[in-house]
């Protein structure tokens, strides 16, 4: 199975690839981009054109020098890939020029560099089972089997904690989990809200890290009574996010009132604690839902995710009132998606992997590709544009305050992922959404604990 970071499956291959490949940038704990293969970048006044200058002296694991053409070739493949294509929705053109990559956008995006933590491989090697990368380790097969060894051409001056990393071939995530439990594997990266078993134990260290995966409740804004913005806002405010994150997502999520990670420096924490939602009873009456005219609305959810089905059931119980009954309809994934695309729903429980520039145009802009609720609001479009042009605390607060009031969606939580190791084995573990091995040069390994 290929280790090409553009086309490999999600999961174990990506974890391994984080040691073999690097991007122009990497995202830190707050989703801020840090330079890796580029030394610096600049943009024009309206943030519609970016130039990324490559770092000098970077070579692939075969000793060949990294070029802008290599970067361009990988990004062109990423543009057509299922995993990364959404990041290029705003890209008009890309070209390599004199050791730099020039990217032109269709509209302003002051946070565009946060999208370029895409792993780069040497052009022409992408069809290899293990394409060539610039990362701290390289893949080798010797008399003892497949392993990773330190890349002697790695560009960093940092000291790596392992000379050799043994690899074990596994057929699926369950097998990997078993091997970790039996300590035949010493590091595992996992989404524990999707795990079939509990990998936690007294001798296991678990380090969670923030992701951009948002769980949210979507509203059909074209169908009464949810066409009423005050009612949508009241329902959003009535969601007990703390109970959902701790009780239904096993603690591997963080409550969020706005569509960006609470770890982002732009997250308006103070506004989240002071924002007042409309009174639900008053909002129902204003929307025409009364004792004489009770209503039933239904939450659509995919039956393939037991965590989300449980959350939907909880929402149905806690959002129902004497005059509003909230029911749940679970559907197979394809039927669920078809119903969303056809607008055949009242509410739906969804999950989306946002990009780290926190552009939610697909969800909230008129005609957005994921705007299943047919929300259309010119003021929201204007605020989205202002935020994209200049991501500041001021533009963020203006946008998120308006979204809380008009409530096309109700953010619930951002999931966390987990890195599991034997207790006491590694000090300094600091995984991020870009890499579970972020800052590996700073690790201290206690080999007697393995």
Identify the role of each PLM range:
Residues 237, 253-287, 305-308:
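Structural transition elements
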Residues 222-264, 400-408:
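Periplasmic-binding protein-like
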Residues 327-336, 361-425, 449-450:
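Extracytoplasmic/peripheral linker and loop segments enriched in polar/acidic and small residues
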Residues 104-166, 172-174:
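Gly/Pro-rich hinge or "lid" segments in bacterial periplasmic/extracellular proteins
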Residues 1-45, 76, 132:
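N-terminal lobe/hinge region of extracytoplasmic solute-binding protein
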Residues 422-450:
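Long beta-strand-rich cores associated with HINT superfamily self-processing modules
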Residues 287-354:
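Ligand/substrate-recognition segments at binding pockets and active sites
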Residues 140-147, 166-223, 351:
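Extracellular/periplasmic solute-recognition and catalytic clefts
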